[in-house]
């Protein structure tokens, strides 16, 4: 039998919060930042929660069923 391995991309992108929810970084903050407003860049730097319909798939990728 082979070993089950976690998806390394998911391992780097998601972190768990105490109440069982998952947090993630927002997208659109990597490049082409000169034409974006400071307010928008500041909002994009905050963490966001993963939607409840996606939690099952993320736990599956992290082998947490």
Curated annotation (Swiss-Prot):
Record has S-adenosyl-L-methionine as a keyword: no
Q: Which Gene3D superfamilies match?
A: 4.10.410.60
Concerning SUPFAM superfamilies, the annotation shows: L35p-like (SSF143034)
The record's keywords, sorted A to Z, are:
Ribonucleoprotein, Ribosomal protein
Query: Which PROSITE patterns did the record assign?
Result: RIBOSOMAL_L35
* GO MF term set: structural constituent of ribosome
Top-level taxon of origin = Bacteria
Instruction: Please give the InterPro entries that the UniProt record associates with this protein.
Output: Ribosomal_bL35 (IPR001706), Ribosomal_bL35-like (IPR021137), Ribosomal_bL35_CS (IPR018265), Ribosomal_bL35_sf (IPR037229)
Give TM regions: none
Pfam entry (one): Ribosomal_L35p
Q: Which GO terms describe its biological process?
A: translation
Q: What is this protein called?
A: Large ribosomal subunit protein bL35
């Amino acid at each position: 039998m082979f070993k089950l391995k976690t998806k390394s991309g998911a391992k780097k992108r998601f972190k768990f919060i105490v109440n069982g929810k998952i947090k993630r970084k927002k997208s659109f903050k990597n490049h082409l930042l000169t034409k974006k407003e400071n307010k928008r860049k500041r909002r994009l730097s905050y963490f966001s929660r993963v939607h409840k319909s996606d939690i099952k798939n993320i736990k599956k990728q992290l082998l947490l069923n």
